[in-house]
Regions:
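Metal-cofactor-binding active-site regions of metalloenzymes
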Residues: 1-139
């Protein structure tokens, strides 16, 4: 049976396909080779190592255009798996470096990409704003 799916706990950066991250890193000449295993998947040993890999993978996302591309890549992959609705956690700690003006630009880029995905692939994205708890309350 092929039922439509919903995704209720998706972190946009965490859902970044490894091939997308490798490609963007290559374009920007950023070395992130240590975050992948021999098969090209993300490699981590425990939760704290996972957080470091997550941050390293996210480090290639530096502009609103990068987040638009990421949004399209994640939603295309989700739609191909039968997802029709996704609730996505978004953090100003990653998108825009805690700058409210930049945050708006990133959200605008994400929203435009999500609207394009909805028109093309029939998948709806809604955002949930969240802090990054391991950064601590001071940030």
């Amino acid at each position: 049976m092929n039922l439509p799916k919903i995704e209720l706990h998706l972190h946009l950066e965490g859902a970044a396909p490894p091939a997308f991250v490798r490609g963007l890193a290559a374009e920007k000449k950023i070395d992130i080779s240590g975050i992948f295993d021999e098969r090209g998947n993300y490699a981590y040993t425990d939760f704290w190592h996972f957080l470091k890999v997550y941050e390293a993978a996210s480090s290639v996302l530096t502009t609103p255009a990068d987040y638009a591309r990421l949004t399209r890549a994640v939603l295309a992959e989700s739609a191909a798996a039968g997802v029709i609705y996704s609730e996505c956690f978004l953090s100003p700690d990653f998108c825009g470096g805690r700058d409210v003006g930049a945050w708006r630009e990133y959200l605008h880029a994400i929203r435009e990409a999500a609207e394009e995905a909805e028109r093309q692939d029939g998948i709806t994205l809604r955002g949930i704003v969240t802090p990054i708890r391991h950064f601590g309350p001071g940030k």
